[in-house]
């Protein structure tokens, strides 16, 4: 039988405020006032009379109110937000960057008054981690309009793995989620990269979505102060059309759903949500979205991954491809293709829901169209090898870059033609000046951007000629996934409707698994012939112009394992010969130091080269290793990557960034390469992290075992953990 005391305690705990609730909940007036009342009502000068009847087998509750023992629920602090925040920053943020890190030289100790003593008794908050968490919590409390709060100590000394996981799931994803419709078009339609004299919100609508044109036209009419420019997209997209649109750059419409407006009761449209990478990247991006989906699915946010697949299907139907990003100047450029795997992962989570099979069918049909119209068509397809290349069309200088980005390249040409820099760019873009050398340069520059690996000495000035192991592994995966899906879910025949027909296809034409299995077998033969190097035991890119295999050692060699195109013998060779070349303290390097070559003032670092590591390379390698049953290698690499992210998070005020220097032990988030490091520039508290790094963290925690996760929470380096496990 349950005792009265046990019941009393259970009731008290059940009414307790969750100390790990999201900030907007935890710092709401109702929640924090309730926390204050609970803290005060448990402050007693004596326990006598409260539990006067001793209960057999239970220890009498300890006296409270005369000291600050932690007790069952930990300390709570009574804090005046503004004054404490000011004192904390003045004392501990010695470099005045609105962050508290191991580089600050303050005393690393600040006393706070406990709630149970009404602030009279004080307790020292010590160390970088707790103080930086305090800075973050006070910043959030202030943003939520709080002047005074009750703060649980458990929010300050929370296990860092739990804290980062919690923030990713409950805060970062929300901070990165966007949608495009009338409610946000004023913000979403503006482009920080807009170079025109009259920057204004602008949206292009494809001819196949007249309902969206009517919707946005009404938005523009109802809200003239927004100055929204609603434009029809030209029916035929050519490099010349895209170039001419650069004088009026704009957002591209994405998928919307029909809903009922609660205020009017009438039908209207609402944008399907998507997750952006973060930092200055605020549109729907290509392969970022796939990587993010891996984490979204882990965090039970499959609805976001599903809507991103639907957005991609819309893009393929109306723009012909999954775009680099949804701005008009990206219309000729795609990114690494992951749609089939993304759709199958989502389908696996929603297959019990009505309409799930239609969702999968649409995604596979869209992938078939993309495969034929983009990746196995001119100019990307190489008929000699049967392999594909990143080789987008386009004219002139990429307009989305900073004006000064190409100044060193173009200045001599401007001088040659006796023009200013701006005059020369305009003349070159519009064909009044023809320079074959520049044409070749920008062909490869666009290809590098399409590859997602911008920039790298692996690809510089050659990318458009390369049949890369990464792209062809992805296309092999498309072929196998499409064959599997048609065979497993559609009785081995899939009818192609008119909107997804391409080339000489006719509406109603059937696709069968054997067609796609045959394509996969052919691609594997070509990959083995041109990209596999038996002597070195790894894959390399192939230069289709020079007709020779490249020598740059890239972590994309492991994409063959992710896709399943490597034989068991090739996979074993990769683990034996390639893996040691790329493994570093923080996980996998993008490339080897030897391949990168010397760097200096005239040859600076490139962000996709040594010594940098990126989340996509880690996740694809882990998955590939597990596919071939190299579980220990996958766990080791995942642990190293997670440890690096966690230590930077602990030591540098909760930072989570786009990329890391995986050779740096102390401050791996500090990257000396072009474009800086998105996610590091914040004041007080990070609210987004970075999309695919967020995903890699929660996805990686699924790779390591439970013991590793506990050890990770104690910030134990891999070598120390491994040594202890092998005593």
Curated annotation (Swiss-Prot):
Its EC number is 3.2.1.28. Residues 47-72 are annotated as: Disordered. Hydrolyzes intracellular trehalose to glucose. The disaccharide trehalose serves as a storage carbohydrate that is mobilized during conidial germination. Regulates the level of trehalose as a protectant for cell integrity. Ca(2+) binds at residues 93, 95, 97, 99, 104. It is an enzyme of class 3 (hydrolase). Substrate binds at residues 280, 287-288, 324, 333-335, 400, 449, 452. Belongs to the glycosyl hydrolase 37 family. The active site is at 454 (proton donor/acceptor), 658 (proton donor/acceptor). The lineage of its organism: Eukaryota, Fungi, Dikarya, Ascomycota, Pezizomycotina. Keywords: Calcium, Cytoplasm, Glycosidase, Hydrolase, Metal-binding. Its cofactor is Ca(2+). Gene3D superfamilies: 1.50.10.10. This is Cytosolic neutral trehalase. GO terms for biological process: ascospore formation; trehalose catabolic process. It is found in: Cytoplasm. Disulfide bonds: none annotated. The gene is TRE1. Pathway: Carbohydrate degradation. It comes from Botryotinia fuckeliana (strain B05.10) (Noble rot fungus). GO terms for cellular component: alpha,alpha-trehalose-phosphate synthase complex (UDP-forming). Disruption phenotype: Increases cellular trehalose levels. Decreases conidial germination frequency. Resistance to thermal stress.
């Amino acid at each position: 039988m349950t005792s009265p005391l046990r019941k009393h305690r259970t009731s008290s705990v059940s009414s307790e405020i969750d100390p790990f609730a999201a900030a907007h909940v935890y710092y709401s007036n109702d929640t924090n006032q309730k926390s204050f009342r609970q803290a005060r009502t448990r402050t007693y000068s004596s326990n006598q009379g409260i539990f006067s009847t001793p209960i057999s087998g239970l220890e009498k509750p300890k006296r409270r109110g005369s000291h600050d023992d932690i007790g069952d629920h930990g300390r709570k602090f009574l804090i005046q937000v503004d004054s404490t925040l000011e004192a904390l920053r003045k004392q501990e943020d010695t470099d005045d960057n609105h962050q508290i890190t191991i580089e600050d030289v303050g005393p690393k100790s600040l006393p706070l008054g406990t709630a149970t003593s009404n602030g009279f008794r004080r307790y020292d908050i010590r160390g970088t981690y707790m103080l930086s968490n305090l800075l973050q919590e006070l910043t959030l409390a202030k943003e939520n309009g709080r002047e005074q709060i009750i703060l649980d100590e458990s929010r300050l000394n929370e296990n860092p793995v739990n804290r980062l996981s919690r923030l990713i799931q409950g805060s970062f994803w929300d901070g990165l989620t966007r949608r495009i419709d009338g409610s946000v078009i004023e913000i979403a339609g503006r482009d920080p990269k807009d170079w025109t004299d009259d920057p204004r919100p602008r949206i292009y609508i494809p001819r196949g979505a007249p309902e969206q044109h009517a919707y946005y036209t009404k938005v523009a009419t109802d809200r003239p102060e927004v100055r929204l420019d609603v434009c029809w997209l030209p029916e035929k997209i050519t490099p010349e059309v895209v170039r001419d649109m650069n004088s009026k750059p704009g957002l591209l419409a994405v998928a919307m759903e029909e809903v009922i407006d609660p205020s009017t009761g009438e039908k209207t449209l609402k944008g399907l949500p998507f997750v952006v990478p973060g930092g200055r990247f605020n549109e729907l991006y290509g392969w970022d979205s796939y990587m993010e989906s891996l984490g979204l699915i882990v965090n039970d946010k499959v609805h976001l991954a599903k809507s991103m697949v639907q957005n991609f299907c819309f893009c393929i139907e109306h723009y012909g491809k999954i775009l680099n990003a949804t701005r008009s100047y990206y219309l000729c450029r795609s990114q690494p293709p992951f749609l089939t795997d993304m759709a199958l992962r989502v389908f696996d989570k929603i297959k019990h829901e009505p309409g799930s099979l239609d969702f999968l069918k649409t995604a596979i049909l869209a992938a078939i169209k993309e495969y034929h119209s983009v990746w196995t068509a001119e100019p990307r397809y190489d008929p000699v090898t049967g392999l594909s290349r990143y080789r987008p069309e386009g004219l002139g200088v990429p307009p989305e870059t900073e004006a000064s980005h190409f100044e060193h390249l173009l200045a001599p040409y401007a001088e040659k033609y006796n023009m200013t820099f701006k005059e020369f760019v305009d003349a070159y873009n519009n064909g009044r000046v023809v320079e074959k050398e520049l044409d070749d340069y920008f062909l490869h520059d666009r290809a590098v951007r399409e590859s997602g690996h911008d920039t790298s000495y692996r690809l510089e000035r050659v990318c458009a000629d390369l049949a890369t192991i990464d792209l062809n592994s992805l296309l092999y995966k498309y072929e196998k996934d499409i064959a599997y899906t048609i065979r497993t879910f559609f009785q081995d025949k899939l009818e192609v409707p008119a909107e997804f027909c391409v080339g000489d296809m006719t509406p109603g034409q059937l696709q069968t698994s054997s067609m796609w299995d045959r394509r996969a077998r052919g691609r594997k033969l070509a990959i083995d012939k041109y990209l596999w190097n038996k002597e070195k035991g790894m894959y390399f890119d192939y230069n289709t112009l020079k007709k020779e295999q490249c020598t740059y050692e890239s972590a994309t060699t492991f994409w063959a394992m992710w896709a399943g195109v490597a034989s068991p013998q090739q996979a074993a060779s990769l683990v034996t010969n390639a893996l040691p070349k790329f493994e570093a303290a923080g996980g996998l390097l993008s490339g080897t130091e030897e391949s990168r070559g010397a760097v200096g003032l005239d040859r600076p670092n490139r962000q996709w080269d040594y010594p940098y590591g990126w989340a996509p390379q880690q996740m694809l390698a882990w998955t590939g290793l597990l596919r071939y049953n190299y579980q220990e290698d996958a766990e080791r690499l995942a642990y190293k990557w997670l440890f690096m992210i966690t230590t930077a998070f602990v030591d540098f005020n909760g930072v989570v960034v786009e990329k890391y220097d995986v050779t740096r032990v102390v401050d791996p988030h500090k990257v000396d390469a072009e474009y800086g490091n998105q996610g590091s520039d914040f004041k007080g508290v990070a609210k987004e992290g970075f999309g695919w790094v967020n995903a890699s963290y929660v996805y990686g925690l699924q790779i390591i075992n439970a013991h590793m996760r506990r050890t990770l929470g104690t910030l134990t380096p891999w070598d120390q953990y491994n040594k202890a496990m092998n005593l």
